[in-house]
Amino acid sequence: MVIFSTGFNYKTAPVEIREKLAITENNYGLILEKLNSIEDIYEICVISTCNRVELYGVSNDNIEKVKEEILRILSQYSTVPVNTLKDYLFFYTNKEAIRHIFRVSSSLDSMVIGEPQIVCQFKDSFTKAKEYKAVRHILTRLFDKALNVSKKIRTSTGISRRAVSISYAAVLLAKKIFGDLKDKNVLIIGAGEMAELAAKHLHSLNVKHIFVSNRTFEKAVELADKFSGSAIRFEKIQEFLPEADIIIVSTGAKEPILKKEDVKRAIKSRKDPLFIIDISVPRNVEESVNELEGVYLYNIDDLKQVVNSNLEERKIEAQRAEFIIDEEVEKFVKWLNALKVSPIISSVRDYADKLRQQQLEKLFKQMPYLNEKERETIDLAMRSLINKLLHRPTMYIKDKAAKEGNTEVVKIFEDMFSSKWDFRKKGKNLEEIEDIVREEQ
């Protein structure tokens, strides 16, 4: 059994690749079902945000086959060739996979360390995977632990104090270029979480007015009302462009919303520069817009510079958080390693119990005069003897399994009994392990 984490994020793949891999709400179930149908995968969960498309799962030891199948499915979905995806794919197993998952849930792997959005996104991805019955007991345990680690880090370090989001980074970039924003009109296209965060930060800087547009007009009205703004119908965006000084685009559209010709017409009646920040993935503003004079277009990857300038004060707290991660990873790895030998121990105990039953049956035939109470006393004595005999080797093998690098002793223990039972049957280990995890929970 192998725990793995794989995928593409802002560190490994540019936005041009990530936007093609981004999994929409409508496609999520289809992709998850395809991944879950891979024979070598036992459990799978997918998280798709503007900064990452990642898969966390449990599989058998055939890792290369797992990687190959994942790439094939993602290539079909994104239309990006497998060989191209290979260049940007990361793939971690076991200890490093667990570490990565803990770092993601704790926002230590985020573009903006300490940003809170990832926790909700992490929970949502797990909830969806549960709905599609793609996760079972191992990933459930891992995700619960990851969220506990995240909470521990947020409460015991200052990692989330003054934490900035991508939306806030966008606002800081606007402030850096314009200086005072009090006389600036802002158009926000989109009404989701990122758009609302941007509106919140802009409102706190006393911009002149906030306009909100969304395909669902009611959502635009709802968001605009929160910040004393105005809602604009989606089909009227082009008419309003000349009035906007700052445009922040954050939608889930698959095609560009703002095109070069639209912006070109808008700037003809403007004297001041137009500042556009596209924090959507896929990008919602045509890249060629940046060719227009007086127009400044930035996408989500451009925000890295703004983000990096705000990371210094979090470095010390991040180091403290990494120590917590290291500690919790070791605990989980020990639990997992000990768990892996549980089917072996269970089979050994089953073998011992069958021997007990055989010997009792033989004994009772030889001593038919024993009454029920006497038989129960003998049975109890044999059970007690077996438990005492197996206790020390069981604890020894669990301890050796929990410590990395002690697989030889475990292998010897397994081989001693493998002639009686095949521990390597497909699915047998997983089912027994899950039973044990279920009992612990």
Swiss-Prot record:
Q: Which parts pass through the membrane? A: none
Query: Which Pfam family would be a valid example here?
Result: Shikimate_DH
Keyword hit for NADP: yes
SUPFAM superfamilies cross-referenced by the UniProt entry: Glutamyl tRNA-reductase catalytic, N-terminal domain (SSF69742), Glutamyl tRNA-reductase dimerization domain (SSF69075), NAD(P)-binding Rossmann-fold domains (SSF51735)
Alphabetized, the UniProt keywords read: NADP, Oxidoreductase, Porphyrin biosynthesis
- Give the active-site positions: C50
Residues of the site described as Important for activity: H100
GO molecular function terms here?
Answer: glutamyl-tRNA reductase activity; NADP binding
UniProt-listed GO biological process terms: protoporphyrinogen IX biosynthetic process from glutamate
Recorded hits in CDD domains, A to Z, give: NAD_bind_Glutamyl_tRNA_reduct
Assembly mode? Homodimer.
User: What remark about domains does the record contain?
Assistant: Possesses an unusual extended V-shaped dimeric structure with each monomer consisting of three distinct domains arranged along a curved 'spinal' alpha-helix. The N-terminal catalytic domain specifically recognizes the glutamate moiety of the substrate. The second domain is the NADPH-binding domain, and the third C-terminal domain is responsible for dimerization.
Family classification: Belongs to the glutamyl-tRNA reductase family.
Descriptive protein name:
Glutamyl-tRNA reductase
Q: Which organism is it from?
A: Sulfurihydrogenibium sp. (strain YO3AOP1)
